Regions:
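Glycine-rich segments within core transmembrane alpha-helices of 12-TM secondary carriers
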Residues: 53-68
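Transmembrane alpha-helix termini and helix-breaking/packing motifs in multi-pass membrane transporters
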Residues: 65-85
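Helix-to-loop junctions at the C-terminal end of transmembrane segments
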Residues: 74, 177-189
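Structural signature of the two symmetry-related core transmembrane helices
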Residues: 1-6, 89, 192-207
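C-terminal membrane-cytosol helix-exit motif in multi-pass small-molecule transporters
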Residues: 89-110
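Helix-loop boundary and gating motifs at the non-cytosolic
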Residues: 129-166
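Intracellular juxtamembrane helix-capping segments at the cytosolic ends
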Residues: 30-43, 230-243
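Juxtamembrane intracellular "pre-TM" segments in multi-pass secondary transporters
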Residues: 105-135
Length: 253
């Protein structure tokens, strides 16, 4: 992810930008599972929900603070895209330095390493885990791209200049709700929070379908952010609790 940022700034063609974006997404795919497995390993079980909620909250905060800073820099630099990508390299380097020099991963309890994707290893993942994965897959089918929310906002009369703020609102609600929902998962069964998240999703979709004014679209966006806050971190909590410790990376992947 960090390596791709300078190449974005140096790109001159659509193909080059596509390759940079592809590399950036590969980086995101590689880092996601180890990050969550590390969080699950170093976090006490009684605050697992709060830990994943905080992680999701900070991630979501970056999703709206970063674009907001980029928009400000674009305005100050008269749309200097290359400078924006060079600036985007700075937080990535800071993060990489923290991981290399400050984050200390605990040594595995079992020194004997086995193939985590073997049939034997997969058999150690419980039926409850596979039911969770199936539920997550079905849940994903009920969701649509955020791009459709933006299109719906424009469709009901929100101006082009204000449309990006729709996503800022959604990510803000997502960020501020993730930690409280995660903390709640340490006190009540996470299944109730997942159920609440599905209710929020259903309410948001119905509101978007029936909305006839910007106010209703914004209400739907708030509900969408709440559904993300009530579900994204909670799925991680479930996986951390259901997967054997030495297979958490595989389970999160």
């Amino acid at each position: 992810g960090v390596i791709s940022k300078p190449f974005f700034a140096l790109s001159d063609t659509v193909l080059q930008v596509f390759c940079c974006r592809f590399a950036d997404r590969i980086g995101k795919g590689i880092r996601g599972a180890p990050r969550d497995a590390l969080i699950a390993t170093v976090t006490p079980k009684d605050v697992m929900g709060a830990s994943f909620g905080l992680r999701q909250s900070l991630d979501s905060a970056g999703a709206f603070i970063g674009p907001a800073i980029a928009a400000l820099l674009m305005w100050l630099t008269f749309d200097n895209y290359r400078l924006i990508f060079w600036c985007a390299l700075i937080p990535g380097l800071i993060c990489l330095s923290l991981i290399i020099f400050e984050v200390k991963a605990p040594e595995p309890k079992n020194a004997h390493r086995t193939n985590p994707i073997s049939r034997e290893a997969m058999g150690r993942l419980s039926s409850a885990f596979w039911m969770l994965i199936a539920a997550a897959a079905v849940f994903s089918l009920a969701r649509f791209s955020n791009a459709f929310i933006v299109l719906r906002a424009a469709n009901v009369g929100i101006s082009a200049a204000m449309v990006p703020l729709v996503m800022v609102l959604m990510n803000a609600v997502f960020a501020f709700s993730s930690y409280p929902f995660g903390k709640a998962a340490d006190r009540i069964h996470p299944i109730w929070l997942l159920t609440l998240g599905i209710v929020f999703l259903f309410a948001s979709q119905v509101t978007l379908a029936l909305a006839s004014s910007p106010v209703w679209v914004l209400a739907a966006v708030v509900l969408w952010g709440l559904h993300l806050g009530a579900t994204q971190g909670i799925f991680s909590v479930f996986i951390a609790k259901l997967a054997p410790e030495d297979l958490r990376g595989t389970a999160f992947g």
